A protein has these predicted regions:
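Acidic, glycine-rich two-metal-ion catalytic cores of nucleic acid-processing enzymes
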Residues: 183-213
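N-terminal leader/targeting and assembly helices and adjacent pre-domain segments
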Residues: 1-182
Length: 213
């Protein structure tokens, strides 16, 4: 006869696989959203740079021309943050339901008061706990700011080196042939991917912690 501990270990392994697959799906959806807004973002960046020739280039003029790009960029990451928030709210409801039925499903009765928190309370607890030293909201704003700085600095360097607008945009965004993975901002995409995966694991861990408190 399989012991309770063995069943719990089996459940933990199976659930870890499920969490990894779910996290991969969330990453794909978030990056697909980012890809859609990037198309508009870089079209606007190209249009802005066309109006800035090398002879009239100044940091002040560049900042003025990038204002609309910066606004669109911030809105893009706001969309990303909202989409991830919605994903995590739906996920925490399912994860909390799983945690509540886990012990009874392997023959361990719940004591009075165990698991009485609501999914919304678990979500609030997860959002109030930092992971890797920051809250989720701070991660989103941090990535957005770093990415915009990277774009601005790359444009400055491009003008100093007399690159064309197309060369500058291609160097920053990457090439379609490589799936845009060869651009300077690829590091920010990988950073966003890591944050999304960690956020899913973080929420799952908080749900488990609340269950055994």
């Amino acid at each position: 006869m399989i012991s309770v501990n063995d069943r719990l270990v089996s459940e933990a392994i199976s659930h870890a696989v499920d969490l990894d697959q779910y996290g991969t799906g969330v990453v794909r959806r978030m990056l697909a959203l980012l890809n859609r807004v990037d198309a508009d973002l870089f079209a606007q960046l190209t249009a802005a740079l066309v109006n800035l020739d090398a002879e009239s280039f100044t940091v002040e003029r560049l900042e003025a021309l990038l204002m609309s790009v910066r606004t669109m960029h911030a809105q893009a990451y706001l969309q990303l943050d909202r989409a991830l928030t919605n994903e995590l709210r739906e996920f925490v409801a399912a994860e909390w339901g799983y945690q509540q039925q886990l012990l009874p499903s392997v023959g361990v009765p719940l004591s009075f008061g165990t698991g009485v928190a609501t999914a919304e309370q678990v979500y609030a607890a997860a959002m109030s706990r930092p992971f890797q030293g920051r809250l989720l909201s701070e991660w989103a704003s941090g990535i957005e700011a770093q990415r915009m700085t990277r774009i601005r600095d790359a444009v400055r360097i491009g003008y100093v080196e007399n690159e064309s607008v197309q060369q500058i945009v291609r160097r920053v965004r990457g090439t379609r042939a490589a799936g845009y993975s060869d651009g300077l901002i690829e590091i920010d995409r990988r950073h966003a991917e890591a944050v999304v995966r960690t956020a899913v694991q973080h929420v799952a861990a908080v749900a488990q912690d609340r269950m055994i408190e």
